[in-house]
């Protein structure tokens, strides 16, 4: 299963915020965009979805930004991926119309595989993903791509 860029970014935002020493300190969208090497507009779109889901809170104002709205140990990764992926089907049987529709065994097999994928990911919480942060040096990595931030 290939995750959408939207989901990938959402997981990275959550991991970054979970690795912060002070969970109460809000992080601005430009800061997250620079650190994670993602377009600021996509960071905003992804963050809005995660605020709506209740995983992040947005603090307005000059010193505002985003911070976790839940405990990392309460946030299961499979639930995050399922919500951000926002699709029920791995294949679209309607476009173009499939001649096997209504009698296809593959669609059921794919649905079971998708559920097994989410179930496996739910064995991990955001707290578990903090292991890939401080101590392993991941939190100290910056974008290695040549990116211009003059538009931020």
Which residues does each predicted region cover?
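Conserved small/polar residues in nucleotide/adenosyl-binding loops
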Residues: 150-152
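Short alpha-helical segments that sit at the start of domains
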Residues: 1-13
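Basic amphipathic alpha-helical segments that dock to polyanions
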Residues: 47-51
């Amino acid at each position: 299963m290939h995750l959408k860029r939207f989901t990938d970014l959402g997981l990275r935002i959550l991991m970054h915020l979970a690795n912060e020493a002070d969970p109460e300190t809000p992080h601005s969208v430009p800061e997250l965009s620079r650190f994670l090497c993602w377009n600021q507009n996509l960071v905003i779109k992804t963050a809005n979805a995660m605020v709506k889901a209740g995983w992040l809170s947005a603090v307005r104002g000059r010193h505002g930004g985003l911070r976790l709205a839940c405990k990392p140990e309460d946030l299961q990764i499979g639930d995050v991926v399922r919500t951000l992926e926002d699709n029920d089907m791995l294949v679209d049987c309607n476009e173009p119309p499939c001649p096997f529709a209504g009698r296809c065994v593959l669609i059921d097999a794919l649905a079971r595989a998708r559920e097994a994928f989410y179930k496996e990911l739910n064995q991990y919480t955001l707290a578990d993903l903090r292991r890939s942060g401080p101590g392993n040096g991941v939190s100290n990595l910056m974008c290695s791509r040549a990116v211009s931030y003059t538009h931020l």
